[in-house]
Amino acid sequence: MLSKTSIVILGLLCKGEKNAYDMLKMIDSMNMKYWLPIGATTLYETCLRLQKKAFIEDSGESQAKAIYRITDKGKQELKNTVIALFNQVDYDTVWFCLAVMYSDILNKEELNTAKQKRAALLDEYEKGTKQNRDIMLQHKVPYSAICAIERMIRIVEMEKETLSKL
């Protein structure tokens, strides 16, 4: 599976060719720094790694700087990663955000299948999490021990709402 930075780069390149500086400007304009900080060095190094894996290539349009474009292999890897992210529940909610942001790489059938699988996972996860919370409440466990579980229930509810609107 791709790293978070790789997902962002490939997702941005799905929209068209860009150099690293333009990608950094786009990331900044999306206010990603608050939930997924990507510095210049990380972006440049990740571009080089993606190029070595043949997920992106230099278009050769500029002598002064690399202008990257996504390859078919890169599109397929991004698609596989987005599908994999829909099929897992993670405490790190950035993964789901990235899956949603770049879900337009999926065709309608792939997206619907991914959404259905995600919804089933969330239903199962929510049920188990609520049962755990209820047991803790029955045993009069202090709220400080329950608050993380409450947070996860809210996250599941928000993700379900997101899926319904996607």
Segments (PLM) and residue ranges:
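Basic helix-turn-helix/winged-helix DNA-binding cores
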Residues: 1-90
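Positions in alpha-helical segments
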Residues: 7-11, 98-101, 147
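Amphipathic, well-ordered alpha-helical segments in soluble domains
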Residues: 19, 23, 46, 125-129, ...
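Hydrophobic recognition helices of helix-based DNA-binding modules
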Residues: 78-81, 129, 166
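Amphipathic alpha-helical dimerization/coiled-coil segments
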Residues: 81-127
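Heptad-repeat amphipathic alpha-helical coiled-coil interaction surface used
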Residues: 112, 119, 123-126, 133, ...
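Acidic interhelical loop/turn segments
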Residues: 130-148
